[in-house]
Amino acid sequence: MLLDKTSFYAEAGGQEYDTGNIFIDGVADFEVTNVQVYNGYVLHTGRLKYGALEVGNEVFSTYDEVRRSHLRNNHTATHILNFNLREVLGDHIDQKGSLVSPNKLRFDFSHKRQLSLDEVATIERMSDDWIRRDVKVYGKELDLQTAYKIPGLRAVFGESYPDPVRVVTLEHDVDAIVKDIENPKWRRTSVELCGGT
């Protein structure tokens, strides 16, 4: 099903899609089981539970908030992990890919050697600390040229980003960072170009 606008997140950048429902109250209910982008169109796939839908119908859509919440949490965890990998292993760490699903995440990165058990334990301890502190997540669209001026900004090497681009930070508001954009202290927090939830 195609909509003129949608609140559903289509699978992209390693993050899985939203699920939910598109409906006309009491008339029809379409269960969305997958959301993908094809040729610039967001396609909601699933099954019609009851009723009928036609081109031009005004519908309501609602994504599964529990699934989205788990996706959002694991997505934020990839930002935390990316930052802590760089802190422990060095600035040469580059994200190569990721998988964000409701019940797990995978983070692919480049490094010169195998991690030691002590490094893994340190990264895990630091990540747990960020989570325990329940740091605030900020997101804002910036023009690409401004975003690239932020010290410590992380991006996926080889990825093509739109202009403007969404910048996601932990602990510090994006507006505060932009007001003091060349401050080297931004290297001590997670600042990334991001297209996820």
Segment roles from a protein language model:
Residues 1-197:
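A glycine- and charged-residue-rich anion-binding loop/surface
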